[in-house]
Amino acid sequence: MEQEIIKLSKDKWQWMSDKNVEVLNNLFLEKSMFVHMGGSWGKEREVNIIKGGMIWYKKADIHDVTVNIIDNTAILLNRITLVAVVGGNEITNPFMVTEVYIKQDGGWKLGSLSFSHLMSPPATGTAPTGGTH
C-alpha cells in the first residue's frame, strides 16, 4: 500500500507540472486544504492557481519519502527541491511536503498538501531517517 501512495504522489507532481487540472480536480477532495509559503486555501483556488499558471510546479526533485498508513489515511512526507515559476520568476526552494491521502470508494484522494520551507537544501545522497523510499 505504501508503494501505491508513493507512486500516486510522484504522479501528482508530474500532473502539477503538466497543469493537468482535470486529473488533479479528481484527485483533490472537495474539502482539501493547501498550505504554501504565501498562505492557505482550498481545492478550487489551488486548481485555479495551477490552471492559470500563477504557480507553475515546474519540477520536483524528490530526495526522501516516508509513508505512514493509519486506517484509511496515508501520511506521506516528501523532502524535495522544488523548481517553480511564481509571478514569472523561476525559483528553487527546499521543502518538506506533507501530503495526507484518504481512501474513499476504493481509491486514494488528496485531503491536504502542506509545504514547509527548509533552511538548507538536502545533502545529495542522504539516507532517509526511516520509512519507505
Kindly give the residue locations of the regions a language model identified.
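A beta-strand edge to alpha-helix "cap/lid" segment located at domain peripheries
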Residues: 1-133
